[in-house]
Amino acid sequence: MSRIGKRPITVPKGVQVTIGEQNLVTVKGPKGTLTQKLHPDMIIKQEGDVITVQRPSDEKLHRSLHGLTRTLINNMIVGVTQGWQRALEINGVGYRAQLEGKTLVLNLGFSHPVRIEPPPNISYIVGERKSANDPLSLTVVGIDKQQVGEEAARIRSLRPPEPYKGKGIKYLEEKIRRKAGKAGKAK
């Protein structure tokens, strides 16, 4: 039995979960609505405010999908109640981020500013720099965990951190392996 898959999911107050045909799960909550089609073999049961996920057999595929299915449903419930966020840090001289309406405008050392339109259900929060050398914080916020992660990865890919000075966009919790520069020539 999957340790994660066998745990029941408690549906909080104010959240409505609908399990349709072919395991089409819809979760409605205070922050919005999420719909996801899950694997049709998995058995999803809702009894009152508790959801359980069971697998039809002990095949390798069903064992691997058991915990995944439970986690996907739980992530949808957390998304519509609390939301998801991913924090990024922008390091580098002249690297800036600001919001123009909902559009994120990044100055990352290119000859032009990079404009990013947010996908539906995604928004950005730009922090303030405390001093000129401090990194700038940027947070991607949304209700779909997968979409928040993809958007954060897309922003990071515009200027990934480089190993010599650490300039670029990195995740807040990411550690960069720094390299020593080349040794100077003796005179």
Swiss-Prot record:
Q: Which Gene3D superfamilies match?
A: Ribosomal protein L6, alpha-beta domain (3.90.930.12)
Q: This chain belongs to which protein, by name?
A: Large ribosomal subunit protein uL6
Among its keywords, does the record have Ribosomal protein?
yes
Specify the superkingdom: Bacteria
The record describes its quaternary structure and partners as: Part of the 50S ribosomal subunit.
Write down the InterPro entries for this protein, in alphabetical order. Answer: Ribosomal_uL6-like, Ribosomal_uL6-like_a/b-dom_sf, Ribosomal_uL6_a/b-dom, Ribosomal_uL6_bac-type, Ribosomal_uL6_CS
Single biological process term from Gene Ontology: cytoplasmic translation
Task of the protein: This protein binds to the 23S rRNA, and is important in its secondary structure. It is located near the subunit interface in the base of the L7/L12 stalk, and near the tRNA binding site of the peptidyltransferase center.
GO MF term list: rRNA binding; structural constituent of ribosome
Q: Which family does it belong to?
A: Belongs to the universal ribosomal protein uL6 family.
Give GO cellular component annotations, separated by semicolons. Answer: cytosolic large ribosomal subunit
Q: Which UniProt keywords apply?
A: Ribonucleoprotein, Ribosomal protein, RNA-binding, rRNA-binding
UniProt xrefs under PROSITE patterns: RIBOSOMAL_L6_1
Pfam families from the xrefs?
Answer: Ribosomal_L6
For this UniProt entry, which segments traverse the membrane? none
